[in-house]
């Protein structure tokens, strides 16, 4: 990422901490997923930044010389979120125009259910997770 070994060690520690912290995550379907970012559009892009950063670490094979497991752990965590975002959003011709990504990766919103719009931060996070999966789809561990 930067070529600095001290930074890389801290980045690995921070990445693993994000994925395992009970303060930063909640359990859904027996899996750890990032907690609710909140509905404030000004404060809800943390996940998008985190997913981008995880993608950069997954693509950097030098990380393996410091920790042989972290890239796969990051990949699995990112894949889990992208899958929930993509699988739960209503992509039918009728539902798609009224569907919104929610602030939780597993709770989409829909004006058809009485929800009002969606957070721009939630959209950004969902888009980053889904786009990241295309960027790392060919990574081998």
What are these regions (language model features)?
Residues 1-2:
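Pocket-lining segment of extracytoplasmic ligand-binding domains
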Residues 6-8, 13-141:
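CBM-like carbohydrate-recognition segments
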């Amino acid at each position: 990422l930067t070529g600095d070994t001290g930074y890389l060690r801290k980045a690995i520690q921070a990445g693993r901490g994000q994925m395992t912290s009970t303060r930063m995550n909640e359990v859904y379907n027996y899996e750890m997923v990032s907690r609710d970012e909140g509905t404030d559009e000004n404060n809800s892009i943390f996940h998008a930044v985190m997913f981008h950063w995880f993608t950069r670490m997954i693509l950097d094979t030098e990380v393996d010389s410091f920790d042989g497991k972290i890239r796969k752990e990051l990949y699995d965590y990112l894949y889990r979120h992208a899958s929930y975002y993509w699988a739960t959003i209503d992509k039918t011709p009728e539902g798609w125009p009224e569907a919104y990504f929610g602030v939780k990766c597993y709770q989409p919103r829909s004006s058809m259910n009485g929800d009002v719009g969606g957070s721009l931060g939630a959209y950004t996070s969902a888009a980053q997770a889904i786009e990241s999966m295309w960027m790392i789809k060919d990574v081998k561990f």
